[in-house]
């Protein structure tokens, strides 16, 4: 960062890759291009929602509750990780076809120059640019993609369900229907998507340029879900004064429109709905549901519904008709993102070794999301719901630094020093209400939701770096950054982040001069400190009064007014601090045909941020964000790049990477407890979480009960190991068992090139990651109460029937805390297989050949190897709770250079 360096002059753990056009697969966003490509970088896409982003972790996570996302720097502009409604992917601003390279900074000796934003690594994205004196080139990239669901959940059909109901005493099957509805088939579809982009690249004498336009029309495999996205990008690189004054000007615009399906709710409904009833109904009850089958009950006499003829409402305890949910619930969003950065570099006349560098960048994002539920909808029956949410943010980042570089005989020195200032502003507004069909007024003043907020924070930084090389063999890098943040109280605002690294180019030693087959042999050692302030509210260090929610309104006459309440705060908060050590070896031989990189690292984060219980009366509420402990990560990484065969007509290329990481909490001061509850809630237990953080355990470990099994390996209902031998099973018998984080991640890409043909395949693997199988635990009650409760039928699964448990709550809510549901989710996935053909110029115009390109066919997600019983083992938070399925896709594409 803050300058350029040759790869063989780097002292830190840095990986630079260029998107491989032959093996990149289907890439609807930038994060797709990193899956399985970089050692120690775990990329998990956020399901199959059109336009969804990804969770990216570099060498595990450095925090418990603050951000674990890397810092993204796009064409010199650091990007704020806060996302807008309708823009869940912060990299959506970039058309993947515009990306020239990724540079991943992994250790603190490389990232410390970015200070408090770089605890989780840095990903630098550079987009394509024109070159001086380059002729005009027009390029087109387009594709058509057909997507379908890979695998469905195994649930009972109508005949199996009736057989099960009739086998259980206490159930009356007379209210079952005569249909045989496959609810999953009713909500999933085969979708068609298209992607097009055009670029114009050229270079006048002093003005290289590139302009591109792209449009992505993506339709999801869950009905009603789609995304339309347009991107415009322009890069200019003018130079003046005989190349002494150079500019890089980058501007981007993104427009996105989304229709979100309530996929989680629809999938849950499809798995829970009674298969003996149809999707649609006619008759008197159709009035209350819009013609969809729902389980209805008589309206409560105290209901605020003004229409006295509205006699029935949906049973709130019953499963929801998933087709109705998709069609009657409309969530749509529109977002715009503008970003730009201007970099200036002036090489001083007469003293060309001294450069003045300055840049100014900005990003502006705005979005509007509308939520509309029909009057006949399940959740907002009769009244309906109309809501609107608006979000706006803008960020301004400016820096300036001096850089001096000169070679004095055997000494090569480069020094830079400068300052940077960043400002981040965010605001939002939301409101919504239901309306009585007769009176036209809100169903209840206290149920009208309305809120508005605005916030901002600033960061002031001073930075410096020294690069020193002796005899082109011994390298030293030293950097220092000081960050001052507006998020902390006086005396705690500043964080200091030093770093140092050494490298030895062994291949340049005199004793290596006769070993000509070695291209590079370099040893690296690095140390550094970085910080973290994300996850802290902008004014959390000071007491404030904030507006209460809609349920805390107070009536004055006929008008309800919002009240103000004191907010939580902590004036003693300080930075999270991460110290990192790294040792690495780079080796390349045989003119680049064989190479590997190996790295070992250790990093420790102190002053961890987490929300913990506090004694009543000390602060508003009973929870407070505090600096409470420390966490360590250590691991090994290995990356290979081999070309086993290189001939005139045939080439075989293989790249492979593997990373092993272990994390452990080393200190935790969690108030009156020795642990901190964390993670997403499971379906059973009314908000129950089964993950905890505790000293000596990995982050987000599962806290469960040890299941007892019979001689055939079948779990025995209600039987758990009495781990403390006190003769009873209670919370003291729970234990920490596994975690969602993988022990090992791997990536493999192999390519075969024969004349104009190319065939490639990419794989990625995760070993040692465990997932809570929420789908089964939520349905593992095969009894009268489990299948028919609160006057509503619920479907089940063959797996639950085989399990044969009759109750989940009888044993103090222990059954669904069984470690039986925490399953090994290790997997090997084939990311994509691509077959392509590159063709030469098709036409000649004015004696110049035109229209060369490539046609290709790709299969995305063709297969997965895993023992996990759920739909997909790739679950980022470890709770497999009705995610939007990742589809299998088939793509036909064309690249054309005119």
Please give the residue ranges for each predicted region.
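Extracellular/periplasmic, surface-exposed regions of secreted and cell-surface proteins
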Residues: 21-22, 69, 162-163, 169, ...
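Glycine-rich, aromatic-lined ligand/substrate-binding cores of catalytic
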Residues: 739-772
């Amino acid at each position: 960062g803050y300058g350029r360096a040759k790869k063989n002059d780097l002292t830190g753990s840095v990986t630079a890759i260029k998107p491989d056009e032959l093996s990149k697969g289907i890439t609807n966003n930038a994060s797709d291009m990193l899956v399985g490509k970089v050692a120690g970088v775990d990329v998990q896409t956020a399901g199959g929602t059109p336009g969804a982003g990804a969770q990216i972790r570099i060498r595990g996570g450095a925090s418990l509750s603050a951000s674990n996302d890397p810092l993204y720097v796009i064409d010199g502009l650091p990007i704020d990780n806060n996302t807008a409604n309708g823009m869940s992917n912060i990299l959506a601003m970039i058309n993947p076809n515009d990306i020239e390279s990724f540079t991943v900074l992994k250790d603190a000796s490389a990232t410390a120059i970015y200070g408090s934003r770089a605890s989780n690594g840095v990903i630098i994205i550079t987009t394509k640019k024109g070159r001086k004196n380059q002729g005009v080139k027009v390029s087109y990239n387009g594709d058509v993609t057909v997507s379908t669901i890979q695998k469905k959940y195994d649930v009972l059909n109508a005949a199996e369900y009736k057989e099960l109901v009739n086998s259980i005493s206490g159930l009356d099957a007379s209210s079952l229907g005569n249909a045989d509805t496959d609810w999953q088939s009713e909500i999933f579809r085969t979708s068609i998507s298209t992607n097009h982009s055009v670029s114009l690249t050229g270079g006048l004498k002093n003005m290289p340029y590139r302009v591109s336009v792209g449009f992505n029309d993506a339709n999801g495999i869950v009905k009603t879900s789609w995304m339309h996205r347009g991107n415009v990008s322009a890069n200019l690189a003018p130079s003046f004064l005989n190349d002494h004054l150079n500019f890089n000007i980058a501007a981007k615009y993104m427009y996105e429109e989304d229709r979100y399906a309530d996929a989680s709710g629809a999938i849950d409904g499809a798995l829970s709905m009674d298969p003996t009833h149809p999707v649609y109904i006619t008759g008197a009850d159709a009035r209350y549901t819009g013609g969809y089958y729902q389980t209805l009950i008589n309206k409560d006499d105290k209901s605020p519904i003004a229409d006295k003829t509205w006699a029935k409402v949906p049973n709130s305890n019953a499963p929801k008709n998933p087709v109705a949910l998709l069609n009657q619930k409309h969530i749509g969003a529109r977002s715009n993102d503008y970003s730009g950065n201007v970099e200036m570099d002036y090489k001083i006349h007469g003293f060309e070794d001294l450069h003045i560098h300055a840049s100014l960048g900005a990003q502006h994002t705005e979005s509007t999301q509308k939520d509309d539920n029909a009057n006949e909808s399940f959740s907002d029956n009769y009244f309906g719901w109309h809501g609107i949410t608006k979000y706006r943010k803008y960020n301004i980042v400016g820096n300036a630094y001096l850089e001096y570089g000169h070679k004095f005989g055997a000494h090569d020195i480069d020094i830079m020093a400068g300052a940077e200032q960043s400002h981040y502003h965010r605001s939002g507004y939301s409101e919504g209400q239901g309306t009585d069909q007769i009176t036209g007024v809100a169903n209840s003043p206290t149920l009208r939701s309305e809120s508005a907020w605005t916030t901002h924070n600033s960061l002031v930084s001073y930075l410096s770096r020294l690069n020193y090389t002796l005899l082109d063999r011994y390298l030293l890098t030293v950097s220092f950054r000081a960050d001052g943040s507006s998020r902390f109280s006086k005396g705690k605002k500043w964080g200091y982040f030093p770093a140092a690294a050494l490298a030895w180019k062994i291949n340049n030693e005199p004793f290596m001069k006769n070993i000509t087959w070695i291209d590079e042999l370099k040893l690296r050692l690095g140390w550094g400190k970085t910080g973290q302030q994300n996850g802290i509210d902008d004014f959390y260090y000071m007491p404030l009064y904030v507006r209460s929610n809609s349920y805390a309104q107070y009536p004055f006459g006929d008008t309800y007014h919002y009240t103000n309440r004191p907010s939580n705060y902590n004036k003693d908060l300080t930075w999270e601090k991460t110290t990192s050590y790294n040792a690495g070896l780079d080796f390349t031989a045989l003119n680049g045909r064989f190479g590997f990189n190996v790295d070992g690292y250790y990093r420790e984060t102190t002053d961890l941020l987490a929300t913990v219980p506090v004694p009543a009366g000390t602060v508003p509420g009973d929870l407070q964000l505090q600096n409470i402990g420390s966490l360590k990560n250590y691991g090994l990484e290995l990356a290979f790049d081999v070309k086993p065969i290189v001939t005139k007509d045939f080439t075989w290329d293989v790249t492979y990477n593997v990373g092993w990481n272990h994390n452990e909490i080393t200190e935790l001061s969690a108030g009156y407890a020795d642990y901190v509850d964390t993670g997403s809630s499971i379906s059973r237990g009314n908000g129950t979480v089964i993950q905890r953080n505790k000293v000596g355990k990995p982050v987000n470990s599962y806290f469960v009960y040890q299941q007892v099994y019979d001689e055939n390996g079948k779990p025995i209902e209600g039987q758990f190991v009495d781990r403390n031998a006190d003769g009873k099973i209670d919370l003291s018998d729970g234990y920490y068992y596994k975690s969602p984080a993988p022990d090992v991640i791997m990536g493999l890409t192999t390519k075969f090139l024969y004349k104009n043909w190319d065939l490639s395949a990419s794989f990625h693997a995760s070993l040692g990651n465990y997932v809570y199988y929420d789908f089964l635990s939520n349905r593992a009650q095969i009894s009268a109460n489990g299948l028919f409760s609160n006057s509503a039928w619920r479907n089940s699964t063959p797996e639950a029937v085989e399990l044969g448990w009759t109750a989940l709550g009888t044993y103090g809510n222990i059954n669904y805390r069984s470690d039986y549901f925490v399953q090994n989710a290790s997997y090997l996935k084939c990311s994509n297989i691509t077959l392509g053909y590159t063709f030469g110029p098709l036409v000649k115009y004015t004696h110049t050949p035109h229209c060369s390109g490539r046609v290709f066919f790709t299969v995305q997600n063709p297969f997965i190897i895993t023992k996990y019983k759920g739909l997909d083992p790739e679950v980022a938070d470890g709770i497999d709770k009705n995610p939007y399925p990742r589809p299998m896709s088939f793509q036909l594409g064309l690249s054309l250079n005119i």
